[in-house]
Swiss-Prot record:
Its membrane topology: Single-pass type I membrane protein
Cited InterPro entries: PTTG1IP (IPR052304)
Keywords attached to this entry: Membrane, Signal, Transmembrane, Transmembrane helix
Signal peptide (from-to): 1-26
Spans within the Extracellular topological domain: 27-97
GO cellular component: membrane
Species assigned in the record: Homo sapiens
PANTHER family xrefs: PITUITARY TUMOR-TRANSFORMING GENE 1 PROTEIN-INTERACTING PROTEIN, PROTEIN CBG20567
Superkingdom, taxonomy of origin: Eukaryota
Transmembrane stretches, start-end: 98-118
UniProt-recorded name of the protein: PTTG1IP family member 2
Location of the protein in the cell: Membrane
Cytoplasmic side: 119-154
Amino acid sequence: MCWLRAWGQILLPVFLSLFLIQLLISFSENGFIHSPRNNQKPRDGNEEECAVKKSCQLCTEDKKCVWCSEEKACKKYCFPYFGCRFSSIYWLNCKVDMFGIMMLLLIAVLITGFVWYCCAYHFYLQDLNRNRVYFYGRRETVPIHDRSATVYDE
C-alpha cells in the first residue's frame, strides 16, 4: 500500500495542474467578463504602439505585445486576458505559442518536483538503513544501537 500512496502523491499535483491549465484555456477561449471600475481611464499609449505593428516578428520584439494569429493583430500583453484563444497567442517568438510555453513550464516544474522527490526518498532510505545491519545467517535486518551516545551513570 505504500507504493500506492507514493504514486498518489506524485499524480495528484499532476492532475491538479492539468486541471488548472485546462480551466485557464477554457476561460481564454470563451472570454472573460470585464467590468472596469472606472471607464474614464486615460488610454495607455502601449495599446496604440502594439496595434501599429502588422507582423508577428515586429510584434514579438516588444515584450509588452502579443501576436494573435487568429485575428492577425498585435495586442497589448495583459495576462490572463489576451482577447483571443490561448493556443493562438505568440509572445517573444513566432514559433511556440503561449500554450506550448505553459506546457514546457509545467513539464519543467514536474521534472524538478520529481527529481526533488527522488532525492528526498533516497536520503530517507539512506537514513533508515544507517541504523540497521543485515545478518546473512539469519536473513533479516536487525537494528543496531547507537554507540556514539554516551550514558552517564552517577
